[in-house]
Amino acid sequence: MDFSKFLAEDFDVKEWINAAFRAGPKEAAAGKADSHAATLVMKLQLFIQEVNHAVEETSHQALQNMPKVLRDVEALKQEASFLKEQMILVKEDIKKFEQDTSQSMQVLVEIDQVKSRMQLAAESLQEADKWSTLSADIEETFKTQDIAVISAKLTGMQNSLMMLVDTPDYSEKCVHLEALKNRLEALASPQIVAAFTSQSIDQSKMFVKVFSEIDRMPQLLAYYYKCHKVQLLAAWQELCQTDLPLDRQLTGLYDALLGAWHAQIQWASQVFKNPHDVVTVLLIQTLGALVPSLPVCLSSGVERAGPELELVKLLEFYDATAHFAKGLEMALLPHAYEQNLVKVMELVDAVYGPYKPYQLKYGDMEEKYLLIQFSEVPLEHGEVIDCVQELSHSVNKLFGLSSAAVDRCIRFTSGLGTCGLLTALKSLFAKYVSDFTSTLHSIRKKYRLDDIPLNSLFQEDWTAFQNSIRIIATCGELLRQCGDFEQQLANRILSTAGKYLSDSFSPRSLTGFQDSILTDKKSSAKNPWQEYNYLQKDSPAEYGSLMEILYTLKEKGSSNHHLLSASRSALTRLNQQAHQLAFDSVFLRIKQQLLLIPKMDSWNTAGIGETLTDDLPTFSLTPLEYISNIGQYIMSLPLNLEPFVTQEDSALELALHAGKLPFPPEQGDELPELDNMADNWLGSIARATMQTYCDAILQIPELTPHSTKQLATDIDYLINVMDALGLQPSRTLQNIVMLLKAKPEDYRQVSKGLPRRLATTVATMRSVDY
């Protein structure tokens, strides 16, 4: 039987009994289940007895083992207590040993100090004796003229002197030793010069060793610099005596310096410990010792060029220098970790320093150059058509000059001259706007827009208007190119000079400005050639202004700036003047007719209608010639304004939207024409006509009954013309015609609600009691 299932967690009695019966003998299935059950019960009872016996035996063994475990625990406890006592005793022994040892060590330390002092005293006595011995032998040694032996003696004396610092005659010994070193240097100087001149590596190494041991390396390097500097200075003087232009002379000098750099680096690397520093100082000293000096050469070269070309010539010289600087930068780049950055910065200053005075006054030079260049762009010509054409051509010339100025600023100052550039550009734009304005005034005079001849015949001439439209298109091109140029200017300034802006800079904050200076000094250590900054030290005010410009561009974005806001406003005013010119050229003919109205004799002269009857119907009257001319002229306006609608000219469209027309719509009027520029112009001219017409009518001194009807007829005609063009007649014009048509006896009633001054004036003209 399988009794293991009794141990299962999911044991089920019924399932086990059923399984036992299924697994039983066949007799159980044949009906002898009772006997099989009795067998199972008997087996279970036997199994229970076995289990009880096993449990009893296990319990008995456990009871027997318990006293032994308790005895073991007690023994372990006693051993732990004994161990604790032993550890306390050991701890006390250690403490006692430490006390005894510290006293012994203190004695040993004192003994060692005494020993050290005695050794030092012994060494001092030995060195003093050695100094005396060497001093006595040095004269004999000098007679041998053996530099190595003399150097060894002097080195020994120098070492001895270091031990004699506290002796009374120490200073005298120092002076004596320096005098001996000077004698050695004087003795060796011819050989030193010969070694450096012939580029003898072995001899040069020997002298480096000797002079290093006697602490005279600066003096040895002075011989090196002098030997090679003489050769380079002679090459420069030879170049200066040629007929070559200065930029070619500079190129020759820089080629010689760069060649010397590469040759000397290769040689010095085998002789000196810090060859790059040595050759860097050689170039610095050479550039500073040139005769004639570079500042003098630049000054004379600029003066010879004259005011017209001084900036151009200066840039030619600067290009040669910048090319040399780039060559040096590339030569130094592979050995950046070996360089003394302070020396490299001194070299950068020596290379670019001669240009600093010109860079600081770059703005003035640029302004002068731009104005001279622009003086060759005349806008004024005899014929109007030539003026218009020159104005159109001048746009590209203006922005060509401006873009070239930006190129020069970046090329010559790396963006540090931005403030001067902006000033120069403002002067250029101011000069351009002034000349453009003068040309517009000249065109007005040629068309006699400000001096209307009243006695001239009425005739349509649209030439002036067409030319004015071309000028408006030119203004639009000016505004468009100005916006593009300003965007490009901001981007180029930020990309070029932005490297000088410190992250800690805060506008109008002294602390931020000082932090930015420190940060810039740190950043200059990265690459002095790229971070050269002449402005920060020599013109801090201008540098602060530049930082504010860069900060604004960076914070607000290069598209949201006001670098040329004054110039842009001036160009907008030019566009407004061009609009006024175009408007006046159209309105001139109308105004010419309207100004005749107050002076017409027909208003106070009795006509045929007066002699017949006052009750003639108004349709029997026809508009007078002056109003007929005006009406026909206005009706022809849409045809001549058509270019505004049909011409696809983005510049013209820009200018038209930027400009403002005179005689804006009255408040409360519907403005359907605003969506169409041609209708906008037509509306403005119509309003100008009606307002001027009203002003002219109110200046008529007297009206007869007949002329009153005639004037009302003329006004009705003009109103019909306006209706035909889809335009609203002005309220003033409607009020006047209403007052003119009113019968004398109804005048007071009709005038109610109308402006009192208007009603009084019309009543006076009609001689109506009011």
From Swiss-Prot:
Pfam families per UniProt: COG7
The keyword Membrane belongs to this UniProt entry's keyword annotation: yes
Superkingdom classification of source: Eukaryota
Compartments where found: Golgi apparatus membrane
Keyword Metal-binding among record annotations: no
Any one GO biological process: protein stabilization
GO cellular component, one term: Golgi transport complex
Record key words, sorted: Golgi apparatus, Membrane, Protein transport, Transport
Membrane topology designation: Peripheral membrane protein
Task of the protein: Required for normal Golgi function.
Subunit relationships: Component of the conserved oligomeric Golgi complex which is composed of eight different subunits and is required for normal Golgi morphology and localization.
Family the UniProt entry places it in: Belongs to the COG7 family.
Protein known as: Conserved oligomeric Golgi complex subunit 7
Organism of derivation: Bos taurus
